[in-house]
Amino acid sequence: MSDVKVYPVDPNVAANALINEEQYQEMYKRSIDDPAAFWAEQAEARIDWFKKWDNVLDFDLRKGHIKWFEGAKLNVSYNCIDRHLEKRGDKVAILWEGDNPAADRKITYRELSALVNKFANALKARGVKKGDRVCIYMPMIPEAAVAMLACTRIGAVHSIVFGGFSPDALRDRIIDAECRVVITADGGMRGSKKIPLRKNVETALAQCPNVHTCFVVQDTQLEIEWTEGRDVWYHEAIAAASADCPPEEMDAEDPLFVLYTSGSTGKPKGVLHTTGGYLLYASITHQYIFDYHEDDIYWCTADVGWVTGHTYIVYGPLANGATTLMFEGVPTYPDASRFWQVVDKHQVSIFYTAPTAIRSIMSQGDALVKATSRQSLRILGSVGEPINPEAWEWYYHVVGEGRCPIVDTWWQTETGGILITPLPGATPLKPGSATRPFFGVNPKVLSNEGKEMEGPCEGILVLDHPWPGMMRTVYGDHDRFINTYFANYPGYYFCGDGCRRDEDGYYWITGRVDDVINVSGHRLGTAEVESALVLHDQVAEAAVVGMPHEIKGQGIYAYVTLMSGVEPSDALKTELVKLVRKEIGPIASLDVIQFAPGLPKTRSGKIMRRILRKIAAHEVDTLGDTSTLADPSVVQNLIDNMPK
């Protein structure tokens, strides 16, 4: 790893940053040596409590037992809105950019307060009370954040289902979380297309007899069916409600939200996060990792249907009194310069997006980026999967013009917030590395036998101590929580990812542990092979899986998407085989390369490798659940064009 390029911290960035290297080392040491004292100090400084805690931390990882700030009382909406009103009442809280470039809205903290209070009262008027579950199935409009915060105001537990999910997936999540109220919109906009959200809800609710209320936001004027007595127009409910709703005092360990994430087997898991620890962790990670200052305009391009949207569009930024930008559209509409047009229009200073979006824009060339200014940008971020070094370099040099540190963040739905990440003023950067652990995070690397390894090594990434933002259970199934995260390696939280730790103590995420290929007894992380493939200037994206091999046990099967205008050829295949051998070694000889116009992805942009593994093994009759695919036709195309 010694030939890896290192980008030192810019002295100007360090001078103005909230955390420099010396402070990072001192705070990190304290957070590991005495976590209870460290987090108590942060909780005092960051959160307004109605009552302080009796005990900072009580845990037993073997039993999946984790409690932070027991006995403390707080309210999330109070911390995200009320406490800012005196000093920041007229500051923009939510800056909304519509799918249509001409559409935008600005909502101040004072205006947000009135909307949240009114909708909280509207929920109460329909019988919603503390502890009730409420399903939110919304487009990326401000009302989605209002609905989340209104639930927290009265102690209801929200369960957001991403607006791209099918009626069946929505039904399953409504039933599993036992929701009796649904909040939706008549439709949503995505790349100039109208998405029939309410129609999907109607289909789902036909099989959800326990849902007694459905609030509908009028957004796209799509015609919808109406069920009298059950359905309520959002705008009418708001108009009739009082703007005064006292915040419910919640225990720190009361549930805040349930968010479903796909399991490697069986039905989706309802990840349950609680109130005090989660909000504290959202606040501290948002402030320090993005080096957030009071005058920043902050934009995370995620959807609130994913955990990134929960923590880094809504709760983290608003807890810190920030202006958070919500974007309804897609990166390629009206064209692939849209992100940078929005950055210039709103003078965005902190920008957080996913590698899949970066690669998609990158494949369209540099001209559309360079046609924009982007001078307001000072911090760039990456989230969702490991970013390959080539995309990192392009993001750094072309988008950020070498001025903006990239925070390549590793975390999960289950962790509530970022765990491994650079800090802009403290961490020298290595393209493709998530670098170092955040405060209170103590990663360990285990061998296949479950033994801790020291120094530079490669193995299974685990954590041996809880942090405040971690999930507390799988909703309604604590045994599944224990079996998934704690049973494999007792005493550790098992995250399912592999990693490499280098000589500087930097962590490189090598992909899911089930995405490890074992070639003739040698372990290869799929992310490493993919990173090698996309070094080729004609490759837009690559996904690599293991395939059955008579001699080697597993061979390497690569699915490769090419840059626009590039034609597949045998000569190109030969170049790619040589490139991977050169980058990783002869052990990484590709057995099959399948060129494809697209890869099967979920609606959040994650590649569905399970399906790719099935195709590579010619097990196309047992693909399993494909309901979360953004474009099912991609799979059929791959099957039809499998190399003979």
UniProtKB/Swiss-Prot annotation:
High-level lineage: Bacteria, Pseudomonadati, Pseudomonadota, Alphaproteobacteria, Magnetococcales
Domain of life assignment: Bacteria
Keywords from the named record: Acetylation, ATP-binding, Ligase, Magnesium, Metal-binding, Nucleotide-binding
EC code(s) of this entry: 6.2.1.1
NCBIfam families, per the entry: Ac_CoA_lig_AcsA, PRK00174.1
N6-acetyllysine found at: K606
Designated name of the protein: Acetyl-coenzyme A synthetase
Residues involved in ATP binding: G384, E385, P386, D408, T409, W410, W411, Q412, T413, D497, R512, R523
Keyword Membrane (UniProt): no
A single BP term in Gene Ontology: acetyl-CoA biosynthetic process from acetate
Cofactor(s) the protein needs: Mg(2+)
The keyword Signal is assigned to this record: no
CDD domains, per database record: ACS
Described function: Catalyzes the conversion of acetate into acetyl-CoA (AcCoA), an essential intermediate at the junction of anabolic and catabolic pathways. AcsA undergoes a two-step reaction. In the first half reaction, AcsA combines acetate with ATP to form acetyl-adenylate (AcAMP) intermediate. In the second half reaction, it can then transfer the acetyl group from AcAMP to the sulfhydryl group of CoA, forming the product AcCoA.
Cross-referenced SUPFAM superfamilies: Acetyl-CoA synthetase-like (SSF56801)
